[in-house]
Amino acid sequence: MIPEDHLQYIRIGLASPEQIRSWAERRLPNGELIGRVSKPYTIHYQTHKPEKDGLFCERVFGPIKSGVCACGKYQGTISTKDSPKYCEKCGVEFTEARVRRHRMGYIDLQCPVTHVWYLKNRPSVIARLLNQPLQDIESLVYYDSFLARPVTNEPTLIRLLPTQSKLYKDRSQSTFDKPLELFLFDEPWQSALSNFFSPKWFHLIQIREMLTGADVIHKLLSGLNLTNAMFHARNQWKHLAKKAPESQSEVIEAQGPVPQAEEEKQRDQSIQQQKDAVLRRITLIRDLLQSQTQPEWMVLRTLPVLPPDLRPILELKDGQLIRSDLNELYRRVLYRNQLICQFSVEDPFCISMMQKKLLQQAIDSLLANGAGGNIIRDRNMRPYKSLSDIIKGKKGRFRENLLGKRVDYSGRSVIVVGPYLSLYQCGLPREMAIELFQPFVIRGLIINHFARNPRAAKSMIQRRHPIVWKILKMIVDDHLVILNRAPTLHRLGVQAFQPVLVRERAIHLHPLVCTGFNADFDGDQMAVHVPLSLEAQAEAHLLMSPYFNLLSPGTGDAIVVPTQDMLLGLYALTLGATLGIYSNINTYKYQSDVSFTQKTDSKIITFSNFSDALTAYHQGIITSDLPIWLYCRPEIAVMNNSQGDCPVEAQYQPKGIYLNVYEHSQIRTDKLGKTVQKYIRTTAGRAVLNQQIEQAIQGTEHAYKAVKQLNIILN
């Protein structure tokens, strides 16, 4: 086992048979090698003690009680320099009982077995790697067909048979990969052949010339050179690329009758599908080369056995035993593994072939119950939980126990919408914040001389002294929190926010960041974590802020975009007359109790700056859709509806000042044509939106400046 302090990362992948053995095999001081599970037994039905060499064997997995051997010769003995390291009689090592939680065993399989994850999953890794149809691969794995074994370079007996017995016939085959020549077991010539030869010689012919089962897949995968396969796959892709049209215009401009153009389209689609398949195969081979994984490891010759404490047998008070489903599935594998040895002596081919098929199905059920065929059930017709069922889903080992652990300085609550928040802010409940930041609050109370010791500070926190909230407010202003929503499917599921204390018990979240979390406000919950170290806080500032997660990492598209009620709100806020100065703001096509604008016969109000317009809006003097004339800087360009920008009205004023009135603007120029004054026709709602956009841009600029300064300090 790797020491915990040396563990830097975990990588899930294929393991070689030698590596699986190294996980479980140990050598006793007398030279005996242990670790192999050979008997399909768990515990004795009377004594409830583990059976030797069974699934709960103490020699293989360690003692049930610390320092107590299986035979009872030694009681409470822990291995030291002077005491023996194991019991000479039963072979149990003197060690702690907790080793049964991580010590593994292994089953030495009597025949190769294909890993169902790499065979049955869509897409099938084995079928893609061998570049063969999945149907043909499955017929070989489950002993429905066979290959003619190439014993010599000369034609074999089966290869001289008529070609109509080939299962693989008239299939579109690739340029560089030959299809498999498969033969069915129920062909008429087989019965005639068995009558011609004696049973002994017929069995020898079958062994000599028929190759089937996972042994075929192992030979094909072990004979596969990944480097050459990559070279051929790339050449195949180039060959297909030459067949494809250079542009879509060649298809559109095709001359001749319509059926001919339709055939060309179908041919191009077929070529594109072949190119996609070859590209996926290239990607798979590249991943195998980079991870230094051998393809033949997808066929199991050694099956690892989980530690017994991960598949326990528990005894209730009334004496009833509760067993893990994995124990029954392991027993089924061991039973069928033993039967192969027994029948291989009596019948070298037929019966042993059926036993190998049963072993393949048993291991399929152990790894993924139901993937290889029928679902195995218990007496109550409840399906057994396989390894796949244990580790997948919300209640699986990863999401329930490993990723879903309770951690310190974390909390969880329901999320609600917080439209008043900035993009980088979140509303944190005060009761949750006082618990998350309690050590920081205690330190703040002591430093500011409000408490003499931690005990007095905790007492103030429990009494909710008013000064506690002020200290907490100072702390959260300088500290980010990390929000996470399960399942974390991509890095946007974990982002850092500046907390804002709220009195409610729900977490307030800005609606624009919901897309990254895949969250909505119908009862979803989110977890809050507090980064403690300086490195974690710097990473939260530099990498995890919503300002630096505006684009999707998968597609590159903008992920922070307004949707639904935000778009309706922006539309209502910026709603105004669209006909310029010709529109009659007092005329509406409909009447309602609550109108957007109060009817008035006054002229359009003129404002000299944004502040006056916003003040009038907030005081209720004007409404959001009431047209106003608003002063703007002369250098700001104004977009008019007319193509030629012709003024609707032109006035000549004293001192040579010209006033040109357009549909959406008024421009005053001097004698030299220089713009002196400019007013734009807009609404108070659009002025509010403009102010919000300016503040957001300024906030982003300040954030980038802060990041640059922090980078300079760190470097």
Swiss-Prot record:
> Listed GO molecular functions?
DNA binding; DNA-directed RNA polymerase activity; magnesium ion binding; zinc ion binding
Identify the Pfam families for this entry: RNA_pol_Rpb1_1, RNA_pol_Rpb1_2
Q: What does this protein do?
A: DNA-dependent RNA polymerase catalyzes the transcription of DNA into RNA using the four ribonucleoside triphosphates as substrates.
InterPro entries from the entry?
Answer: DNA-dir_RpoC_beta_prime (IPR045867), RNA_pol_asu (IPR000722), RNA_pol_N (IPR006592), RNA_pol_Rpb1_1 (IPR007080), RNA_pol_Rpb1_3_sf (IPR042102), RNA_pol_Rpb1_clamp_domain (IPR044893), RNApol_RpoC1 (IPR034678)
Chief place of localization: plastid
Q: Keywords on this record?
A: Chloroplast, DNA-directed RNA polymerase, Magnesium, Metal-binding, Nucleotidyltransferase, Plastid, Transcription, Transferase, Zinc
Q: Name one GO cellular component term.
A: mitochondrion
Catalyzes what?
RNA(n) + a ribonucleoside 5'-triphosphate = RNA(n+1) + diphosphate
Gene Ontology BP annotations: DNA-templated transcription
> Where is Mg(2+) bound in this sequence?
D520, D522, D524
- What is the protein's name according to its record? DNA-directed RNA polymerase subunit beta'
Renumbered to this chain, region (Disordered) spans 244-272
Tell me which SUPFAM superfamilies the record gives.
Answer: beta and beta-prime subunits of DNA dependent RNA-polymerase
Q: Binding residues for Zn(2+), per the UniProt record?
A: C69, C71, C87, C90
Q: How does it assemble?
A: In plastids the minimal PEP RNA polymerase catalytic core is composed of four subunits: alpha, beta, beta', and beta''. When a (nuclear-encoded) sigma factor is associated with the core the holoenzyme is formed, which can initiate transcription.
According to its UniProt record, this protein's enzyme class is transferase
The record's remark on the cofactor is: Binds 1 Mg(2+) ion per subunit. Binds 1 Zn(2+) ion per subunit.
